[in-house]
Amino acid sequence: APLTQHVSKEQRFRCHSQTSRQDPLISNWIHRIDTQYMPSEAQRDVLVLLPCSARKPYSRSQSHRFFRSAIRNRSVHQVIVTSPLGLVPRELEEQWPAAHYDIPVTGDWDSDEIDTIQRMVSNLVNRVGYKRVINHSGIEFDLDVETIDTRAEGVGASSKSACQTLQIAIDDAVEQFNLENIREKELLKHQFSALSMWQFGTDEWLQDLHVGGKPPRWLLLDGKQQMAQWHPDSGRFSFTKSLLPKLHSTGTLPVVEIGGDAPWKGDIFSGMIVSAPIDLKVGQEILVVRNDTLIGSARSLAAGWEWQGGVGRLAKSQHRL
């Protein structure tokens, strides 16, 4: 599995050859989307498939601004069709490597790319149970659900006529399936839950929280108290000290045990480690315990295998309780 969970916004993953498709980072993404990923329950009726863009995240591109103006209901689930990742759900577009890969956008697909995308879409549709698929990607699909193609052959996806056709198809689906246009912060809560499931395998820690603040760094609040903040540039949540006990009790973050009797000061070094998960990733948030007591949090600077008998600094401290 990939050894890094988060990277700086400047980092790029270059996909300029077919061999890049074999990279563990790519195969891990495809496997998870293909077999595990589920959208929020609020977005499981209508799926719209959109083409990718050279600019990442996609929503910052001109073409996707056109698409989003045509998709006027937030209950419609947007998924971007791309290579080599196959599919990128809108709520995951700020994740590594979806926000960082660099590939020439030619509009031409080889048979392997098409086969991968068609398989992934079919698996996603069958697993989620969408009632209708609106296909604006330009790729043909043979699905066991009603599919509406909104791009005429040879017509650009972001052209005025194509976007009008897309908007008509969306509006028709909204009316036919009586889709409620959920509020922005309600949608954000659903999307943060999906992001939490993707990153941590659970969203229990945020179930009682609500979204506040202003874009792009939204806050997750308990009443008026900030518990977490979303950082879109790095695709991560930052947690406040007061949330650590809940993150621990819900099993959200991996746990590292350190030894010694002196007060914990500074960062975490190899000589301090009693135990650590073997699958830790660079950039991953971890909880720190001593003698079965939670004492703080840190951010991993090394992959899990380096924690087993390695040397040097392994994690940067974040909070102390």
Question: Which residue stretches match the model-derived regions?
Answer:
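Extended, charge-rich low-complexity interaction segments
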Residues: 99-133, 178-205
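Well-ordered, non-membrane alpha-helical segments in soluble/globular domains
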Residues: 58-70, 106-123, 162-169
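Anionic-ligand-binding alpha/beta catalytic cores of soluble enzymes and soluble regulatory domains
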Residues: 175-252
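Beta-strand/loop-dominated core regions that host nucleotide or nucleotide-derived cofactor-binding catalytic loops
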Residues: 227-321
